[in-house]
Amino acid sequence: MENTQENPTSQNPTPADEAARQAAEAASGEPQDQARQPAAAAGEQPAQAQPAGAEAALAEAQAKLAELQESFLRAKAETENVRRRGQEDVAKAHKFAIESFAEHLLPVMDSLEAAVAHSTDDLAKVREGVELTLRQLTGALEKGKVVALNPVGEKFDPHRHQAISMVPADQEPNTVVAVLQKGYVIADRVLRPALVTVAAPK
């Protein structure tokens, strides 16, 4: 028959164990069982506070992200509006670029139509009408910043003049002696160079 009696020393502390426990309690000022309980409770508090702080930080980050997304969408929409308005302005500028210039040419057209409708054998009147029309056309061109080049006496400029020939002349070499065909510039940009003859070197 097996012996089921437990060792009494496993349940009942010996005098030596009791003396060691009492010495430890005296050194700490409180029983060891009570000292372990607050420590365990103190260790649980950060674990409870940490999730609450993390949730608050996550909520703040999500709110900031939503704000940035909204700002981005507004900026994108505004950029698209500016781009569309710019395209419309460019299209209008191309479409009506010569509107003002064409308006200045209308009086010239009126004068030419009137001259054709009114026939006369008086050459003096015909010449007078042509001169008037020419003045109107010149004025219309000048309003459009188109100016004639008539560089007689000026130094030859290959950017504004086209030399047809060089002729003996009293002027300094490379001086424009005669203009065979006027040139024209628009806002300092050459539309057509003037055809000229130039003084030859002596």
From Swiss-Prot:
GO cellular component, one term: cytosol
Organism of origin: Paraburkholderia phymatum (strain DSM 17167 / CIP 108236 / LMG 21445 / STM815)
Annotated function: Participates actively in the response to hyperosmotic and heat shock by preventing the aggregation of stress-denatured proteins, in association with DnaK and GrpE. It is the nucleotide exchange factor for DnaK and may function as a thermosensor. Unfolded proteins bind initially to DnaJ; upon interaction with the DnaJ-bound protein, DnaK hydrolyzes its bound ATP, resulting in the formation of a stable complex. GrpE releases ADP from DnaK; ATP binding to DnaK triggers the release of the substrate protein, thus completing the reaction cycle.
One Gene Ontology biological process: protein folding
Entry's family note: Belongs to the GrpE family.
Compositional bias (Polar residues): 1-14
UniProt lineage: Bacteria, Pseudomonadati, Pseudomonadota, Betaproteobacteria, Burkholderiales
The keyword Cytoplasm is assigned to this record: yes
The protein's name in its UniProt record: Protein GrpE
